[in-house]
């Protein structure tokens, strides 16, 4: 009976140790991937200065063409704001600015024109509700655009690092518990 219990304990310890090592390895790989993809985007982001923006005007523009999409037309929102003591164009994120500089907000689904127009109208109404809001600007003097939301801000970086940290901590705890269990069983066998 005692020998079977020891064999089962060794198998269980081996499996737990393999699980802990696998969790640590997955965390290390994920940290590497995040370090080569997300961290450079965070470091290169120039939109670091948080400013207070005041709404000046909003326009819904139709018949805009989006490069790379098969959708011939879509509505887009154009927003002018006053930020850092000057007029600026507000963009939803960095990607919105890169996709089409004529649009402040591009709806997510471009398949149905009426749904896209309703989405743009809803966003426009929210801007008119809140005339003053926080936005992100750059420290460059000649820049005439600001962002409503940063894609690669500190919150996004911390959110992406949560699960690898959780995996690493869990894996190290499992490995530590197996090692403690082994040392306690050796001490118990010696008595």
Swiss-Prot record:
**Annotated GO MF terms:** calcium-activated potassium channel activity; potassium channel regulator activity
PTM characteristics: N-glycosylated.
Q: Which GO terms describe its cellular component?
A: voltage-gated potassium channel complex
The cellular location(s) given in this protein's UniProt record come to: Membrane
Q: Does the entry feature the keyword Transmembrane, yes or no?
A: yes
Instruction: Name the residues that span the membrane.
Output: 16-36, 158-178
Bilayer topology = Multi-pass membrane protein
Q: What is its main location?
A: membrane
Q: Which UniProt keywords apply?
A: Glycoprotein, Ion channel, Ion transport, Membrane, Transmembrane, Transmembrane helix, Transport
Q: Does the keyword 4Fe-4S apply?
A: no
Q: Which Pfam families match?
A: CaKB
Glycosylated at which positions? 80, 142
User: Which residues face the membrane's Cytoplasmic side?
Assistant: 1-15, 179-191
Residues on the Extracellular side?
37-157
Q: What domain of life does the native source organism fall in?
A: Eukaryota
GO terms under biological process:
detection of calcium ion
Q: How does it assemble?
A: Interacts with KCNMA1 tetramer. There are probably 4 molecules of KCMNB1 per KCNMA1 tetramer.
The UniProt family comment states: Belongs to the KCNMB (TC 8.A.14.1) family. KCNMB1 subfamily.
Task: Please describe what this protein does.
Answer: Regulatory subunit of the calcium activated potassium KCNMA1 (maxiK) channel. Modulates the calcium sensitivity and gating kinetics of KCNMA1, thereby contributing to KCNMA1 channel diversity. Increases the apparent Ca(2+)/voltage sensitivity of the KCNMA1 channel. It also modifies KCNMA1 channel kinetics and alters its pharmacological properties. It slows down the activation and the deactivation kinetics of the channel. Acts as a negative regulator of smooth muscle contraction by enhancing the calcium sensitivity to KCNMA1.
- Designated name of the protein: Calcium-activated potassium channel subunit beta-1
Q: Which gene encodes it?
A: KCNMB1
